[in-house]
C-alpha cells in the first residue's frame, strides 16, 4: 500500500499508512500561507479491502464549515469522478472506501490539470474568432494567458471573465471550459449573436502556480489574488497586475469572476452593492441578470448567499468590486459549491465538473439576454 501526491495539484502528507484500516493523513498548507483545504492524492491499495483514511487536521482548515455534509471525490481513471462516504467529527475528516481496482485517486473536487488548461487554450486559438494572448509570466514562470474572442467595434461591449483566482476552486475552470466551448460553436445562434454585439476577454486560470502546487487560495508568493486588486504588484501578484492593466487598456462593460464556495451547497452570485458609485442603474442591472439566470436554469438560486455589503463598505481589494467601481459596470462574483446543489441534488457525483461546465454554457445565455442593457 502506497500513497502519493507527487503530481500536478497533488497535496497530502502521510503520517501513518501501515494498515488499510488506519491511514492517517494531513493536508499541507498553501506555501507562505496558513490556508489549507485542497487535497489530491493517489492510493495504491489492497483491492476489495476497506480503507479508512483520516485527515487529522481538517478541523484546522481554512473553512471548517466546508466539511459539514461533504463527500470526497474518487476516480480510477482520472476522468470519471464519484462521491465516496466521508464523515467529519469536528476535527477529523474520515474517508471510507473499498477499492475495486489497484489504484484510485481522491480529491477535494474534480481536478483541472495544467495540461488540460493548455489544451483548452490551444484548441480555442484554432477558431477564427479567437486569439491566444500572453500578458506575461507568473512568479514560477508560467504564462498568464487570456483568450480574446471576437473583435472590437463601434457600440460593441467588452466582456471579461476570470476564473481560479483561488486555484483549489477547480469548478471555476470547468465552468470556463463549457463557456468557451459554447462561445466558439459556430452552429450556436446565441454565441453568434453575442459575437456581433460584444468582444470577450477570458482568463480560464488566473493562478497557474497555485494550481500546480496544490494550493487552495494562494499563488507562489503566498498572495490571495482576490485581495490584491487595489494595489497589485509584479513582485507579489503579477497575475492580477497583468490582467488589471489589460482591463484598463480595453475597458470593461461586464465582468464575471468565477469561484467556488466551500460551505454553501448552492450556486449564487455576489454583487457590488457596497461600492461607492453604486446607484439605481447598477442595481437594476444586477437584478435583471439574476432574474434572467433564474429563468434559464434551476441550478441557480438567489435565496442563499453572502451577506450584502452596507452602502460604501465594499472591500475594493476584491476583483468584482474593484472592477465594478473602476468601470461602473455590471460586475459579479459567481460562486459554485464544492458539495452539491441542495436544491437539485445528485448523490452520485454531487456538484461536478460536468455540471459546472453546463452552468457555464447557461451563463452565456444570460449574457445574451442582458448585453443590450449594459451601457
Spell out what each predicted region is:
Residues 1-100, 104:
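Extreme N-terminal flexible tails
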Residues 38, 103, 222, 329-331:
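Extracellular structured ligand-interaction cores
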Residues 56-58, 335-339:
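Short, loop-centered acidic/histidine patches that primarily coordinate divalent metals
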Residues 62-69, 116-119, 156:
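A short, polar/proline- and glycine-enriched secondary-structure boundary/capping micro-motif
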Residues 63-64, 107, 114-117, 169-171, ...:
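Short helix/loop capping segments that flank catalytic or ligand/cofactor-binding pockets
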Residues 87-138:
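Extended acidic/polar, glycine-enriched regions
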Residues 131-149, 154-316, 320-324, 331-335, ...:
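Active-site/substrate-binding loop(s) of hydrolase catalytic cores
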Residues 343-375:
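His/Asp/Glu-rich mid-to-C-terminal helical/loop segments that flank catalytic regions of hydrolases
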